[in-house]
UniProtKB/Swiss-Prot annotation:
TM region(s), chain numbering: 9-29
Keywords assigned: ATP-binding, Cell inner membrane, Cell membrane, Ion transport, Membrane, Nucleotide-binding, Potassium, Potassium transport, Transmembrane, Transmembrane helix, Transport
GO cellular component: plasma membrane
Cross-referenced InterPro entries: KdpC (IPR003820)
Family annotation (PANTHER family): POTASSIUM-TRANSPORTING ATPASE C CHAIN, POTASSIUM-TRANSPORTING ATPASE KDPC SUBUNIT
Recorded name of the encoding gene: kdpC
Subcellular localization: Cell inner membrane
One Pfam family matching this protein: KdpC
Identification of the protein by name: Potassium-transporting ATPase KdpC subunit
Principal cellular location given in the protein's record: membrane
């Protein structure tokens, strides 16, 4: 009995050290060597300050910016509250929110169909991407607010459209933060008069 107890305690200590200390440090070290940017959250900096992450969305509300899709992660892309809403398609709370979002987008739609990712959240609630259709839907508004041509803006969106991974995984997508940063660099907002 004493031998079994010693063996059990020893196994617990060994596995705790191996799996709780050695393995995480090894994986962290390998990630820092081979995937430094990805291991550190793919932070985007401007003027020496971190302004966001390439892999975590953030809200944009001004009319001169492309807007991200709605977030189910708390109050606007709160990473500590990540996750879907678990609201089913017949849940009245979800139905009311979608109706409200559709109503708010109707003036901008001008008869065009509203892309589904403009009114639905992603599984994590933190998705930094929108579909190319979502970006296209917003082109007229952003071009008008920035005082630039829709053609010029579509070229900018095309430059930021990422294809499928390995040619067949996922869907084409546009990173909203990167697009808006490039937009600010290409065509700063007009100064108010």
């Amino acid at each position: 009995m004493k031998k079994n107890l010693i063996t059990s305690v020893l196994m617990t200590v060994v596995t705790t050290v191996l799996l709780g200390l050695v393995y995480p440090l090894l994986i962290t070290g390998l990630a820092q060597v081979f995937f430094k940017d990805k291991a550190n959250g793919q932070i985007i900096s401007a003027n020496g300050h971190a302004i966001g992450s390439r892999i975590i969305g953030q809200p944009f509300t001004g009319p001169a910016y492309f807007h991200s899709r709605p977030s189910a992660a708390g109050n606007g892309y709160d990473a500590s509250n990540s996750g879907g809403t678990n609201l089913g398609p017949t849940n009245q709370k979800l139905v009311d929110r979608v109706k409200q979002d559709v109503s708010a987008l109707q003036p901008e739609a001008n008869g065009k169909p509203i892309p589904v990712d403009m009114i639905t959240t992603s599984a994590s609630g933190l998705d930094p991407h929108v579909t190319p259709a979502n970006a296209e839907f917003q082109v007229a508004r952003v071009a008008r607010e920035r005082g630039m041509s829709e053609t010029q803006l579509r070229q900018l969106v095309a430059r930021h459209t990422e294809g499928r991974q390995v040619g067949f995984l996922g869907e084409p997508r546009v990173n909203v933060l990167e697009l808006n940063l490039d937009l600010d660099g290409t065509q700063p907002m007009p100064t108010p008069r």
